[in-house]
């Protein structure tokens, strides 16, 4: 609980693994099983005045309570056994009611740019990977279980449940691998330029394999 700073990396819109090569992230309405990457909400955030912002995660007992507490920049989702109110807002922002789970950031953005938030539920078994891709804005995840290794041109970073998440700004290519021995379960945010796709495949950069398991 409480604040979590410096938390950005790997939403998995181009998943593959040995048993399911080339699987992409799909709308949750098309879900056919638990494992995979599922788009659970897309929310226009609007023009953001500052060069950084934060992702606030609160849990409510019921969807009705969460809906009643919604603010501009908020969306209610039911994911991973909980009812979440997810909000893009300044550092220290709070609503009444609910349980504050995390404040993730700062997320580096372009002041004055118009953004949209795409939220996903990611459930990976160890060994699943996300082929190389980029994002049109910062990406963040909140990990409830498991471990993930993210490789970028700057090296590798490890995100674990209970540890500090990883931040990657928009732009650089990345390659993600679910590592460890436990199923990875996470909520994922891509805060992207509203005029661009959230995720784009990257073919010019080849990872070094720093996250091999």
Please place each PLM-identified region on the residue numbering:
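A short, N-terminal "cap"/entry segment at the start of jelly-roll beta-barrel domains
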Residues: 20-114, 202-213
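Short acidic-glycine-tyrosine-enriched beta hairpin
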Residues: 28-29, 59-64, 124, 152-173
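Ligand-binding loop in jelly-roll beta-barrel domains
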Residues: 52, 79-83, 149, 169-197
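Bacterial N-terminal signal peptides
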Residues: 5-16
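Glycine- and acidic-residue-biased ligand/ion/polar-headgroup-sensing regions
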Residues: 30-31, 136-154
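Extracytoplasmic
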Residues: 114-119, 184
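N-terminal secretory signal peptides that target proteins for export/translocation
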Residues: 1-3
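A short beta-loop-beta micro-motif enriched in histidine and acidic residues
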Residues: 112-116, 125-142
């Amino acid at each position: 609980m409480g604040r979590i700073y410096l938390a950005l990396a790997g939403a998995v819109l181009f998943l593959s693994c040995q048993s399911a090569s080339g699987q992409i992230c799909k709308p949750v309405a098309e879900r056919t099983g638990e494992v995979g990457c599922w788009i659970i909400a897309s929310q226009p955030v609007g023009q953001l005045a500052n060069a950084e912002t934060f992702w606030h995660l609160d849990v409510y007992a019921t969807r009705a309570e969460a809906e009643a507490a919604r603010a501009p920049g908020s969306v209610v989702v039911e994911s991973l056994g909980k009812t979440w109110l997810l909000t893009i807002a300044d550092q220290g922002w709070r609503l009444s009611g609910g349980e504050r789970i995390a404040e993730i950031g700062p997320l580096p953005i372009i002041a004055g740019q118009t953004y949209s938030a795409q939220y996903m539920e990611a459930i990976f078994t160890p060994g699943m990977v996300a082929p190389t891709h980029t994002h049109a804005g910062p990406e963040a995840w909140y990990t409830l279980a498991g471990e993930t290794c993210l490789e970028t041109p700057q090296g590798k970073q490890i995100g674990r449940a209970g540890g500090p998440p990883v931040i990657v700004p928009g732009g650089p290519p990345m390659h993600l691998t679910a590592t460890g021995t436990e199923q990875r379960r996470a909520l994922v945010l891509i805060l992207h330029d509203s005029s661009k796709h959230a995720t784009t495949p990257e073919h010019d950069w080849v990872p070094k394999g720093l996250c091999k398991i």
